[in-house]
A protein has these predicted regions:
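Surface-exposed loop and adjacent secondary-structure segments within mature catalytic domains
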Residues: 1-2, 48
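Acidic, His- and aromatic-enriched active-site or binding-groove loops in soluble protein domains
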Residues: 2-32, 67-69, 207-210
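Active-site-proximal cap/lid insertion segments
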Residues: 13-16, 31-186, 190, 199, ...
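Short Pro/Gly-enriched beta-strand edge/turn motifs at strand-loop
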Residues: 129-131, 208-214
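Short, hydrophobic secondary-structure boundary micro-motifs
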Residues: 157-159, 323, 353-356
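His-Asp-centered acyl/peptidyl-transfer active-site segments
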Residues: 201-206
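Bilobed periplasmic-binding protein-like "clamshell/Venus-flytrap" ligand-binding domains
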Residues: 338-355
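Short, charged, surface-exposed hinge/linker loops at domain edges
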Residues: 354-368
Length: 370
């Protein structure tokens, strides 16, 4: 955790790097020391360094990632400008730090002789924080995360699943790997039939549900959520925004027609404006340049209010920039996905469908901010 902060503050960078990875190895060693001989184990490694904050310019300083190399390669939902490219490079540096830590753990397993006897799963939990359509959004930039699984002799090497799956699928997958049955009507699905010899995507559901309620507690004056549910198929994303009158990234707070927080404040204080978007140089740049020519679409991607329904054709619009919910040519698809989503939510007794239960106690309390 705090990888770029630790190394940036250190006089001896190599010593600081060694300290960081020694801590990773020691935590794993301490865990294994409590293990009986040949006892199965489950170890979860969850560093937070890819969450804000990280040091501005650290991608280049620590990992030799030149932000200019990203020019022309940025997702179309953000302006391709130096400040935002640098922010992206810094994020990628934190990802590389995570990769290096994982490599240290894999090396330990190899030295123990347990590498080929261990299921290794590597995943993210959400998209990049502090970016439009990133963390806290159900669009792919915010919800599509890496998921890689290694289990020699059990999972086909380089097998790529091309239909959406979810991290809730890991629990039934682990139970199946251990020879145990999942509870009746599990939320997730066992992925092994699609990963093992003879596996194919047709053995999976073929879709995934995505949802959010709230992120920052006081993102809105009365602690109101921004409830969203979505269904992702290989070809489409359907989104249901239950409260389209609310700001999706939180209330503007200090951003008005005539005033705004400083760049420095927006980089350090998530609550300065639109608190469901984490503090970042990208967020600060967008706020400070929101009135510039050509910025309207980027501001809309970042925190503009959204319609009750969104529909995206991923074969034609992989970055989900063209909402087709009102396009009559897609009315059949819209109805089908809407019905499928609502059916699944009702089947799982989603509290949002029970008279907006998430807006009342115990899920909700009034904020005291004035």
């Amino acid at each position: 955790n705090s990888y770029s902060e630790l190394l940036t503050a250190a006089i001896d960078k190599e010593a600081a790097k060694k300290q960081a990875f020694d801590e990773v190895r020691k935590n794993f060693s301490d865990f294994l020391a409590k293990r009986k001989k040949n006892q199965p184990f489950f170890y979860s490694f969850n560093p937070t360094n890819t969450h804000r904050t990280w040091v501005q310019g650290s991608g280049k300083a620590l990992w030799n990632l030149n932000p200019d190399d990203l020019k022309g390669k940025m997702p179309p939902v953000v302006p391709d400008v130096p400040e935002i490219r640098e922010d992206m490079a810094d994020y990628l540096g934190e990802v590389m730090a995570f990769d290096a830590a994982c490599a240290a753990l894999v090396t330990m397993l190899q030295e123990m002789g347990e590498l080929d006897n261990t299921i290794i799963v590597i995943s993210g939990d959400h998209g990049i924080p502090g970016f439009p359509r990133g963390k806290c959004n159900v669009h792919d930039f915010g919800s599509a995360v890496p998921l890689a699984i290694r289990w020699p002799k059990k999972i086909l090497p380089q097998r790529i699943v091309k239909v959406p799956v979810s991290l809730i699928d890991l629990a039934p997958t682990f139970l199946a790997a251990a020879g145990l049955e999942s509870p009746d009507d599990p939320d997730g699905q066992n992925l092994l039939p699609a990963l093992s010899q003879g596996g194919d995507d047709a053995k999976l559901r073929g879709w995934a549900l995505i949802g959010r309620e709230r992120h920052a507690g006081a993102a809105r004056v009365e602690h109101n959520a921004y409830p969203v549910r979505a269904i992702r198929t290989p070809d489409f994303l359907y989104v249901k925004n239950f409260k389209p009158d609310r700001w999706p990234m939180g209330d503007p707070y200090k951003v008005t027609d005539t005033s705004e927080p400083t760049f420095a404040e927006l980089v350090k204080n998530t609550y300065a404006a639109f608190p469901d978007m984490d503090m970042s140089p990208t967020k600060a740049w967008l706020v400070n340049h929101r009135k510039d020519a050509g910025m309207e679409k980027f501001i809309d991607y970042a925190w503009g209010k959204r319609p009750e329904e969104e529909l995206y054709d991923l074969t034609k619009d992989p970055h989900q920039t063209k909402n087709l919910a009102t396009n009559s040519s897609y009315s059949t698809t819209l109805t089908k996905l809407r019905d499928q989503l609502m059916s699944e939510l009702k089947n799982k007794k989603d509290p949002r469908l029970e008279n907006d239960a998430f807006d009342r106690a115990p899920y909700h309390t009034k904020d005291q901010r004035k």
